[in-house]
Amino acid sequence: MDAGAQPPDTEMAEAGGGQQPPAAAAAAGAGAGAGMMENIQATLSHGGRFIQYNIFGNVFEVTAKYKPPILPIGKGAYGIVCSALNSETGEQVAIKKIANAFDNKIDAKRTLREIKLLRHMDHENIVAIRDIIPPPQRNSFNDVYIAYELMDTDLHQIIRSNQALSEEHCQYFLYQILRGLKYIHSANVLHRDLKPSNLLLNANCDLKICDFGLARTTSETDFMTEYVVTRWYRAPELLLNSSEYTAAIDVWSVGCIFMELMDRKPLFPGRDHVHQLRLLMELIGTPNEADLDFVNENARRYIRQLPRHARQSFPEKFPHVHPLAIDLVEKMLTFDPRQRITVEGALAHPYLASLHDISDEPVCSSPFSFDFEQHALSEEQMKDLIYQEGLAFNPDYQ
């Protein structure tokens, strides 16, 4: 992106009002930072080709080019994330360790999908994979280490902090999300899990979309497979188990995220499925019959028996939000996905006129192929596919 497109005052202080810097969120959507740790012991292994670190009692074993200091910056259900220096390139990276990555087939498939998708994509607003670190020995391949470009924080951390955000910040974040999403959708891919913690940021407000483990093709009919997208950002067609879904599901999520950014609290913080649907109808109103054409008869019956809600006035409910921003959000938060604004339509909306430049909003040169998922892969096949990805980054390693 042309640096000139950036608003002049988007240099951002560290979240948390000048105290501890925010967690350097890795592409795992890592949560809060684990704090700086000094004197982490490093031991060379496998004839000096690898280096082992002991972090939180976990062995972190990477190729020897990743030099100290290595710092834990996040922890999640998948494992641990550390920042490290690649001594060959001089670049700081975020390394995610996925421990026992092949124990659960669904998780292994998610890891493989994320690797293949991110290797296919090349865009300023999508986090890049820098390395898949091969195991010291192919026959004992259990843990997967993925190195991503390192970012300073994520949108969830910023929203929770006392970091002041100007209208220009929010506008610029929205623009970058849509710019990245245009590229993703052009590759025939739906992200399906957009939320603030999957939007990484650095101090000069560059934004990158991460976590493609739930991504799917836009033409897929096998609907709810492994579908666990965060409820608060879920489009109504997903809440109603619609058998068909489109790129419009991601647009709904972006509308929710933008309003959370403006309001500093989630727009629809549903406690469960039913509560989620109720919250969104309380704001945008009960849909009419024409808006329900896309859902099945069971879902239509269910909605008809719910208490009816009139649409609330967005300008009255959110008086602090710019009228053009309200207009765009209302077009994103449209119940019927067929009527919802597209990513291209959103980029061309007057609210983003100062940033929009169609010649600098690239699309993907070729659609992504999910063919590798067409057949049930064994654990060994998945290991081999990920191992081959590692060799692509490390051609000298055999």
Swiss-Prot record:
Q: Could you say which EC number(s) this protein's record lists?
A: 2.7.11.24
The answer to whether UniProt assigns keyword Kinase to this entry is yes
Which stretches does the entry tag as region Disordered?
1-26
Q: Where along the chain is the active site annotated?
A: 193
Q: Name one Pfam family in it.
A: Pkinase
Membrane-spanning residues where? none
What regulates the activity here? Activated by threonine and tyrosine phosphorylation. Activated in response to sphingolipid elicitor (SE).
- Residues where ATP binds: 73-81, 96
Where Phosphothreonine occurs, the residues are 225
Question: In which family does this protein belong, per the annotation?
Answer: Belongs to the protein kinase superfamily. CMGC Ser/Thr protein kinase family. MAP kinase subfamily.
Q: What is this protein called?
A: Mitogen-activated protein kinase 1
- Origin species: Oryza sativa subsp. japonica (Rice)
- Gene for this chain: MPK1
